[in-house]
């Protein structure tokens, strides 16, 4: 048994990894900022100690896992080196963990967390599968055969992994503080492709993914009949989305997903293909798919009188489009109200016009102040720059959430990667409801 200390344990990936190591019988603790983050609920439920940052947390005999947001000058990392302890960064450590399993990496600019959550749930319907999801959920199952995990492209962290399979959902320009342009992102994915040992499952309609070369087979999925696996005869029902699946041009089976939206069909196709390649029992897969309840902060719904409140991580124009599309398909008779908090000044500046265009697809738009990352300070851009580009958009904060009460028959989308949940929480509390995210 190893004693692990996670520096930045409330980070979504770090929280998941800490839970996995705890489940596998190791002694685990960690440190982070003294502020509530939704990831800590799962940690506390498993009895994992969360400490405020302090060099005294670091003791002899520990192995230190260093979160991506923390440099070698962090006080706890400095103390670890003074004690001559082993310090391993998050992606390197995760790369070591996956080596003992048949591993499936899920990567892409959008859809990683939802697809990883679906993959882990569905595979566990037939085979023991440990998993690491980017919503702060992790589970280490003893004697697992498979390991499903989210692999982030930011700063090329995913190059630390050599998975058996990779699901590549899409390539898009994001993280403008690191990547120069979409070609730079594509080059990173190309490097990742050469790390894959068995096969790549990629969205066939993505022009950038179509350029990827690999030393293993690439299987394309989509809604077009020229793909290796595709969906046809799509029907939206009160229970979800039903569709037929074809593999190599031949009818495979009919599936029912409890989710809505084309992006969720695509995610499901990718998962089905991986299961098919590994020979999992199709009836078990179908049954597990029908019971998938989603992942944290991905279209999580709460009913409030005649309103549906949705908590969603969407923080890129393309993700906002998908979230609004899902709301319209699932609730065609309700207004769609967008409450959005931009995440990072660099992303807001890079996609200012695209944010305005995507948000304008909602019936009404409310915007929160920009949530800056710990790495940046940029006063040259304000939320007013985005408000001015969206007709009728208004500023919203915890002190004026009651304005949302006027939308009686509506889906209210609270979107963002920062602390947008405080706005939804304030609105619910003002309506006499408490909710712990």
Swiss-Prot record:
Listed InterPro entries: Mur-like_cat_sf, Mur_ligase_C, Mur_ligase_C_dom_sf, Mur_ligase_cen, Mur_ligase_N, MurCDEF_pg_biosynth, UDP-N-AcMur_Ala_ligase_MurC
GO cellular component, one term: cytoplasm
Pathway(s) this gene product operates in, as recorded in its UniProt entry: Cell wall biogenesis; peptidoglycan biosynthesis
Reactions listed under catalytic activity: UDP-N-acetyl-alpha-D-muramate + L-alanine + ATP = UDP-N-acetyl-alpha-D-muramoyl-L-alanine + ADP + phosphate + H(+)
GO BP term, example: regulation of cell shape
Known EC number: 6.3.2.8
Domain of life: Bacteria
Major enzyme class: ligase
Localization annotation: Cytoplasm
Keywords tagged on the record: ATP-binding, Cell cycle, Cell division, Cell shape, Cell wall biogenesis/degradation, Cytoplasm, Ligase, Nucleotide-binding, Peptidoglycan synthesis
Family membership: Belongs to the MurCDEF family.
PANTHER family: UDP-N-ACETYLMURAMATE--L-ALANINE LIGASE (PTHR43445:SF3), UDP-N-ACETYLMURAMATE--L-ALANINE LIGASE-RELATED (PTHR43445)
Protein name per its UniProtKB record: UDP-N-acetylmuramate--L-alanine ligase
Gene giving rise to this polypeptide: murC
